[in-house]
């Protein structure tokens, strides 16, 4: 059983996508960010950076004590290696998958997060910041589109943790002031992932938002 400490953000959705695809048993534990749940001492013991997602794996592969982990990229890599799913053992596809996973956690996520902040959450309108992050968002979508024009999935021939990491951020394209039709390869990729049964299940459980066990 895996406890997933979760809020319905792109980073949170990454982990539910993987858990549903892998059909792992997990309990969804909502962290109320609006009420400061991320600062509670019991959560900080699991995620000292006071961010979601975080997991506690009660059945780690080494058979030892429960293993806690924070940072969405680290969690995806851990789960992929534990299950043998969504990360190729072939050298080149594995390298490409990790490359695009790290591109997401180091670039796509932070920049789109700033786009969202200055468009929707900043206490005052700052035209320079809005324009800066809009231009960078468009650049990143262009990079993603170029990759997907030449490869069915980000890592290569197979759906992987790189796709799982990027999709929830792209799924918020309307709030990023992006016209997805301008990026046809991204649009096709987004629709293919949205149509996967596990994606629907993951989004449904996130919408329910209560603690529950998938068994």
From Swiss-Prot:
- One term under GO cellular component: cytoplasm
Database matches in InterPro entries:
Glutathione-S-Trfase_C-like, Glutathione-S-Trfase_C_sf, Glutathione_S-Trfase_N, GST_C, Thioredoxin-like_sf
Outcome of swapping residue 166 to A: No effect on disulfide-bond reductase activity
GST C-terminal domain: from which residue to which, for each copy?
A: 90-215
- UniProt-annotated binding residues for glutathione: 40
Q: What is its EC number?
A: 1.8.4.-, 1.11.1.-
Residue ranges the record marks as coiled coil: none
Asked if the keyword Oxidoreductase belongs to this entry, the reply reads: yes
Q: Which residues bind glutathione 1?
A: 11, 38, 52, 71-72
Instruction: Quote the disruption phenotype from the UniProt entry.
Output: Deletion of yfcG decreases the resistance of the bacteria to hydrogen peroxide.
Q: Where does glutathione 2 bind?
A: 132
Where would I find the GST N-terminal domain in this sequence? Answer: 1-87
Q: Which GO terms describe its molecular function?
A: disulfide oxidoreductase activity; glutathione transferase activity; peroxidase activity; protein homodimerization activity
**Enzyme kind, highest EC tier:** oxidoreductase
Q: Per its UniProt record, what Pfam families does this chain match?
A: GST_C, GST_N
Q: Which BP terms from GO are recorded?
A: response to oxidative stress
Q: Does the keyword Nucleotide-binding apply?
A: no
Output the superkingdom of the source species.
Bacteria
Q: Which UniProt keywords apply?
A: Oxidoreductase, Peroxidase
Of which family is this protein a member? Belongs to the GST superfamily. Nu-class GSH transferase family.
Q: What else is known?
A: The reductase activity of YfcG is unique in that no sulfhydryl groups in the protein appear to be covalently involved in the redox chemistry.
Instruction: Briefly state the protein's biological role.
Output: Exhibits a very robust glutathione (GSH)-dependent disulfide-bond reductase activity toward the model substrate, 2-hydroxyethyl disulfide; the actual physiological substrates are not known. Also has a low GSH-dependent hydroperoxidase activity toward cumene hydroperoxide, but does not reduce H(2)O(2), tert-butyl hydroperoxide, benzyl peroxide, or lauroyl peroxide. Exhibits little or no GSH transferase activity with most typical electrophilic substrates, and has no detectable transferase activity using glutathionylspermidine (GspSH) as the nucleophilic substrate.
PANTHER family linked to this entry: DISULFIDE-BOND OXIDOREDUCTASE YFCG, GLUTATHIONE S-TRANSFERASE-RELATED
The record describes its quaternary structure and partners as: Homodimer.
Protein name listed in UniProt: Disulfide-bond oxidoreductase YfcG
> Organism source for this protein?
Escherichia coli (strain K12)
């Amino acid at each position: 059983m895996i406890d997933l400490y979760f809020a319905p953000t792109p980073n949170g959705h990454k982990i539910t996508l993987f858990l549903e695809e892998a059909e792992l048993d997990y309990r969804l534990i909502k962290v109320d960010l609006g009420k400061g749940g991320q600062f509670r001492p019991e959560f900080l013991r699991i995620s000292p950076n006071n961010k979601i997602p975080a997991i506690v794996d009660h059945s780690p592969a080494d058979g030892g004590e429960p293993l806690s982990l924070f940072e969405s990229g680290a969690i995806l890599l851990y789960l992929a290696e534990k299950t043998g799913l969504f990360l190729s053992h072939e050298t080149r596809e594995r390298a490409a998958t990790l490359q695009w996973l790290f591109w997401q956690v180091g670039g796509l996520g932070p920049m789109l997060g700033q786009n969202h902040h200055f468009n929707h959450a900043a206490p005052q309108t700052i035209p320079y910041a809005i324009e800066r992050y809009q231009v960078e968002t468009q650049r990143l979508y262009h990079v993603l589109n170029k990759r997907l024009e030449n490869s069915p999935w980000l890592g290569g021939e197979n759906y992987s943790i790189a796709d799982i990491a990027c999709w929830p951020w792209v799924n918020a394209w309307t709030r990023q002031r992006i016209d997805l039709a301008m990026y046809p390869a991204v649009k096709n990729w987004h629709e293919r992932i949205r149509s996967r049964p596990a994606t629907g299940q993951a989004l449904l459980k996130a919408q329910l938002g209560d603690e529950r066990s998938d068994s």
